[in-house]
Amino acid sequence: ASVTVGYSDAVTGARQIKLLGLSGIYTQMLDENRPSMRGLAAPFGLSYVPGQWLESIQVSKGLSSVNNGAESITGQINMEYRKPTDEKPLFLNASVMNDTKTDFNIASSLQMGEKWSTVLLGHVSGNFRTFDHNHDGFMDDPEMFQVNVANRWLYYGPTGVQVRFGLRALQDMRKGGQSGYDHKKYTLSSTSPWGSDIVNRQLNTYVKVGVPISADNAKNIAFVADYTLTDMNLRAGASKYL
């Protein structure tokens, strides 16, 4: 297959996409045509997009348009979320996998009159038990707990003016390495289990405004603004980073 997803780091659980054989830094990730998963958000970006939140995914292989940035070398992957105008007013999903990963999702679309609509999205997931199937002393997948919430709004005016804006907040905690690792007790001279602790907090907000400039709405002018704040704290062994 030309699109694959793999672990780049089994200790932290970071994942990356390979498109046409090249790693994820050459693939542009888009959130409804807005560039996403940049900088500190890149290693765990895929983990912060619950599958049940998505309506569709579009994959464009090869050199793509530079309208949304110039980092697309092997292609673009655009994710379309559930819309405020979704016909399903309430969606609930829960799953427990055989590796004890638990996953809960909710999506609720609300119509606030003829012009306004909104969608509320919620996600809670976690790995609550360690496992080491290959018996190498290291956890095959890190313990993790994630809370992810989002609220998206749509205004559609009678003249064709559209305003879309939203807010998303998440907290992700991961503990990898050897089972029993505690950064408060670990020292370089000790024989205590080695591991890593990661706490990642992220806040994202955006606004998109489209104004038609022709009678048939075939032409329009748009304004897009996006802001992401990422706060990551990492402890690996006795060292603290970021």
Q: What kind of feature is each model-predicted range?
A:
Residues Q28, S56-S60, Q76-R82, P89-N98, ...:
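Predominantly transmembrane beta-strands of Gram-negative outer membrane beta-barrel pores used
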Residues T4, Y26, S36-M37, L63-N67, ...:
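Short beta-strands and strand-coil junctions in structured, solvent-facing domains, enriched
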Residues N127-N148, L154-I221, Y227-L242:
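Flexible loop and strand-edge segments within Gram-negative outer membrane beta-barrel domains
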